[in-house]
Amino acid sequence: MQAELVIKNGLVILETGEVITDVAVQGGKIVAIGQDLSGERVIDATGLVVSPGMVDAHVHITDPGGGYRDEWEGYVTGTAACAKGGVTTFMEMPLNQIPATVDKTSLEIKYKAGENKLKVDVGSFGGVVPTNLADGIQELDEGGVSGYKCFLGTCGDRSIEGDFQNVDDYSLYEGMKQVAKTGKVLAIHAENAPITDKLGAVAYQNGETTLAAYVATRPVFTEVEAIQKAILFAKETGCRIHICHVACQEGVEEVLKAQAEGVDVTCETCTHYLYFTTDELDAIGPVVKCSPPIRDADQQAALWNHVQTGGIAFVTSDHSPCTPDLKDTTNAFEAWGGISGVQNNVDVLFDEAVQKRGLSLKQFADMIAANPADRYHLAQKGRISIGKDADFVLIKPNAPYILKAEDLEYRNKISPYIGREIGAQVIQTILRGETIYAQETGVTEAFNGVFIKN
């Protein structure tokens, strides 16, 4: 019997390691792995690495924009960038869309905004904020979110009704108790708000303008203290937690220490922390501003070590786009803090991790797909194995190219990777057996993606 699709002769990353073999797909699922399989459609992957499609566990899509952020990043452009970049599934953050996703009503608004606009599959985070502790967390659970998100650092615009808010200590404690009852994971932006806010205000008042000065207002200890607090509260409440975008080795070490004590905690870092360092930020400009900030070369080397040894569970983009005017300033303190990166996870990470640092292909696939899928219970995602969704990214190794602005599918062609030579290329992306991007034909016109509801 012929399968609907067979991917032939690729170097396929399996649970047991990589092997040159064929993969057969029927009804959007992987149905066979082996030699000499036959299919109605055949993709010749000779010379290519066949990886599970990336599961990017940290992406912001600003849809709906609520009249405030309508030009930031919608589902159409954001998911097109995912397709071109080899991301077949992402976890969408509950901000910066208006309204923020914090209860049944706002979750339904978000689902409605994405109807017939998704080129990839999307899991959802619900927010934990001071205003949704009555019943919002339970409503989000019933509405199918795959996890929750809160901010310890300051976030949101208080002048915009319905924008996201960071938690105070009581809201964190009470929110964790409620999330614990759902059994789902609370992802945490861990920075000390009072100290970073004050240091930033003082630096701005003193006339500081550089990105180096901005980094100095968010010192390592402000990240570590917030991680320690989150872990302490997790011990008290039994809440499963995940620390987002860790930018320092000391933060990872706190997570590892807590794991050894039996706490259900994991952490991620982001592609940009593994690629850029503080000393080059001002030459690049505000396009590379984010929080926590990009730290020095020693911190980057330590993060890479934790990636290689598994202390960092997975790597994300923290794709946080905005309009060009919010980056067009000579004062780093006035610029929007967020990096557009979802289109250049797979190629940059393959080059930096596998080709330059010798990470195994199995480790690569775990880092971009299996581990995030497991953490957020995306049961059909993350692995090339029989019965899983047929989600693949085909990668051409040792194929350098220079990224140009016109290559980007984002609504706003902003990225710190523009002009950089990237040493691998995404050749094709497949979602549940359907090609959603091919290098020779571009991104599909179809909207085959769905919201995953847990």
UniProtKB/Swiss-Prot annotation:
Carboxylation allows a single lysine to coordinate two zinc ions. Binds 2 Zn(2+) ions per subunit. Its cofactor is Zn(2+). InterPro entries: Allantoinase, Allantoinase_bact, Amidohydro-rel, DHOase/Allantoinase_Hydrolase, Metal-dep_hydrolase_composite, Metal_Hydrolase. GO terms for biological process: allantoin catabolic process; purine nucleobase catabolic process. Zn(2+) 2 binds at residues 149, 189, 245. Its EC number is 3.5.2.5. Keywords: Hydrolase, Metal-binding, Purine metabolism, Zinc. GO terms for molecular function: allantoinase activity; cobalt ion binding; zinc ion binding. Pathway: Nitrogen metabolism; (S)-allantoin degradation; allantoate from (S)-allantoin: step 1/1. It catalyses: (S)-allantoin + H2O = allantoate + H(+). GO terms for cellular component: cytoplasm. Zn(2+) 1 binds at residues 58, 60, 149, 318. The modification N6-carboxylysine is found at residue 149. Signal peptide: none annotated. Catalyzes the conversion of allantoin (5-ureidohydantoin) to allantoic acid by hydrolytic cleavage of the five-member hydantoin ring. Homotetramer. Belongs to the metallo-dependent hydrolases superfamily. Allantoinase family. NCBIfam families: allantoinase (TIGR03178), PRK08044.1 (NF005960). This is Allantoinase. It comes from Enterococcus faecalis (strain ATCC 700802 / V583).
